[in-house]
From Swiss-Prot:
Residues spanning the membrane: 30-38
Role played: Structural protein that may protect the integrity of the bacterium.
Signal peptide region: 1-24
GO molecular function: porin activity
Entry superkingdom: Bacteria
Encoding gene (name): ompA
Source taxonomy: Bacteria, Pseudomonadati, Pseudomonadota, Betaproteobacteria, Burkholderiales
Protein name according to UniProt: Outer membrane protein A
Length: 194
């Protein structure tokens, strides 16, 4: 390469480098190179120059209001209620008893008082009977709970049912007391306050 070419190349390189540095350090009268608003030492007043107009004001300076952030929706809360199945159903049955209906009336009232996302009804049984029979019985019980809640005005698309049969005991199945505790319906309500 000859000397004029080297000189032209060096000059072009210097121009490109200088323009990059200049643009990186370009600061209008409102922000520093890092994008922060320049303010006085007490952080109360914004710096501006003679070209400032109210139309060029930025939020947080010179009376220009800061845009309000939209309110975040409260996170859904979950409440889990466990009902003994003996309260809802007779032994080996899936038809709701009057006491069970009264409790489900309270559940429906709670569900209507919130911005409901979902209700999950999970039926459980004790260990008496075959696994397949108990699974079907627990599913029928959960379906009865759903049908009743739907009859009380709860959206059926918001209610999910599941039967666990005898798979999730919370007490020993060796005693009558333990078996009674294992015959249960768990109802979980998920939603947020209105």
């Amino acid at each position: 390469m000859n000397k004029p070419s080297k000189f032209a190349l060096a000059l072009a390189f210097a121009a490109v480098t200088a323009s990059g540095v200049a643009s990186a350090q370009t600061v209008d009268n409102w922000r520093n190179p890092y994008g922060n608003v320049w303010k006085n030492g007490t952080n109360e007043l914004c710096w501006r120059d003679a070209f400032w107009t109210p139309a060029t004001g930025i939020p947080g300076c010179d009376g220009v209001p800061v845009a309000q952030q939209p309110k975040e929706k409260p996170a859904p809360m979950a409440a889990k209620v466990v009902f003994n199945a003996d309260t809802f159903f007779d032994f080996d049955k899936s038809t709701l008893k009057p006491e069970g209906r009264q409790l489900l009336d309270q559940v429906a009232q709670q569900a209507r008082a919130i911005d409901l996302e979902t209700i999950i009804a999970v039926g459980n049984t004790d260990s008496i009977g075959t696994e397949a029979y108990n699974m079907k019985l627990s599913e029928r019980r959960a379906a009865s709970v759903k049908a009743y809640l739907v009859s009380k005005g709860i959206d059926p698309n918001r209610i999910y049912t599941e039967g666990k049969g005898k798979l999730n005991p919370i007490a020993s199945n060796k005693t009558a007391e333990g078996r009674a505790r294992n015959r249960r319906v768990e109802i979980e309500i998920v939603g947020s306050r209105k």
